[in-house]
Amino acid sequence: EEAKAIGETVQWAGISFVTSAADVSEQFKHSSRLNKDLRPFLTKKLSSLDNLSFDLNTGNSERSDDGTISFLLATDTERISTGKLNVNNEIRCLSIYSISLQAIVYDQKSQSILQIIPFAGEVNHLDPLVGNDCKKRNNDLDSLRILLFYLSIDKSRAEQLELLKIPFEERVNQLLKESNDQNSLETPNNLF
């Protein structure tokens, strides 16, 4: 209803990051790595939505000053915190993956932000302690867990390690297909 009041068409502007362009790959190491696959996946999901109270354009906008309202999804924070945890008299590594996003509604004509809707989540993983240190990171495992988190797909540690045997692009495509087949983005409390 709100979108009807401010305009008939809402333009999907894609995924972005809340930082300067030079800092993206450093500040959002895993999300930026996944962006090229998540962007078309989300665009396709959005284009298949029915019963919206407004027209949603997921293609390119012809002009930036035509009065169209745009919205984008911006990753604000990507953080992995670690620490040791005693679990049944065994020291393990607890990794906490935190993501915060902002849905930003933007008026192209006046070049003003109409609304920012923040949302965030976190997921925990327990791993074996290796060499009395929890600071050493497996970047592929971290990227996999960030993707699983975005897609609301739950995999055991053993399943995650099996997935790491698959080349990165193939692994991402397999999980996007699984998400699509299971409608995992419709899971309550999904980040997207």
Predicted regions and their residues:
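Surface-exposed short loop/turn segments
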Residues: 61-113
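Short, Lys/Arg-enriched charge-dense amphipathic segments
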Residues: 79-89, 138-145, 186-190
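Short secondary-structure boundary motifs at beta->alpha junctions and helix caps
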Residues: 28, 91-93, 108-158
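Unusually extended, aromatic-enriched hydrophobic runs near protein termini
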Residues: 49, 73-78, 96-100, 120-123, ...
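A structural detector for beta-sheet-dominated domains
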Residues: 13, 18-20, 74-76, 83, ...
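A structural "domain/chain start" motif
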Residues: 1-54, 62-63, 129-135, 147-192
